[in-house]
Amino acid sequence: MDLIIASRMDEASMLMAEKIIDLYDFNRLNENEYQKDGFKLMFIDDLHIYHNMEKLDFDTLIFLSRHSSSAGVKSLTVHSIGNYRKAELGGYDNKTVLSAPYEMSSSLRSIKELYNDDGYNITFEATHHGPYTKNRSYFIEIGTSGEDWHNDKILEIMARSVIEKNVKRFRSGIGIGGGHYAPKISDYFFNNDINIGHIIPKYVSETIKDNQIIESIENTENCSFILIDWKGSPSRLRSLALDAADKCSLELIKI
């Protein structure tokens, strides 16, 4: 069973949760919990990025969330959880958590299939922020304003991409390089039968340590490759990726 988590401090999170409950007729267990088939939905009072948790008896945790963009870019995104530097938005410094490459990638693939317009950027984001969990987990987000969060068509797409996603067990790997939205990694993903877990962006290239890349590999289930945006990776990050691929006997895919 998977656990869907909605924060009462996040309007988009609440709206997505309400759409899931209504669309799939979830059964109310109590004021904070609903359930249907292989999913439980839980409301929390604090902001999800700060809601650290010990190991829970669920397969995957799915956090519903708003997405913020200083540029106002309309986006539908998914991303793994953790920090490659100081934890300014939840979690722990320099620590990633277990990603969910099969489920997260399948949610993004579902969004892409269901949304056939040009109004939103559909993409991975690099691994960032909290909370710290001991379960496989990922965020699914709507950005970037109230207009987007209240868009009924978008809410239905996101709900369906959580509940109805067709989980494909393609081989999984991590991404390295590029900006926060990892455009080349996302494009390659949509055109190849792969799944992605953690993504390490170029903006951490000067401070990331080799053990953090190894941890990202270990926290990506059945990781078999590193997908690297070669031109979008400074020389230090390229070198660390090459070393990690060699140490962990992974295929290095340059794009």
Swiss-Prot record:
GO terms for molecular function: D-aminoacyl-tRNA deacylase activity; zinc ion binding. It catalyses: a D-aminoacyl-tRNA + H2O = a tRNA + a D-alpha-amino acid + H(+); glycyl-tRNA(Ala) + H2O = tRNA(Ala) + glycine + H(+). Pfam families: tRNA_deacylase. Binds 2 Zn(2+) ions per subunit. Its EC number is 3.1.1.96. One of its GO terms (biological process) is D-amino acid catabolic process. It comes from the Archaea. Keywords: Hydrolase, Metal-binding, Zinc. Gene3D superfamilies: AF0625-like. The keyword Metal-binding applies. Its cofactor is Zn(2+). D-aminoacyl-tRNA deacylase with broad substrate specificity. By recycling D-aminoacyl-tRNA to D-amino acids and free tRNA molecules, this enzyme counteracts the toxicity associated with the formation of D-aminoacyl-tRNA entities in vivo. Monomer. Belongs to the DtdA deacylase family. This is D-aminoacyl-tRNA deacylase. It comes from Picrophilus torridus (strain ATCC 700027 / DSM 9790 / JCM 10055 / NBRC 100828 / KAW 2/3). The lineage of its organism: Archaea, Methanobacteriati, Thermoplasmatota, Thermoplasmata, Thermoplasmatales.
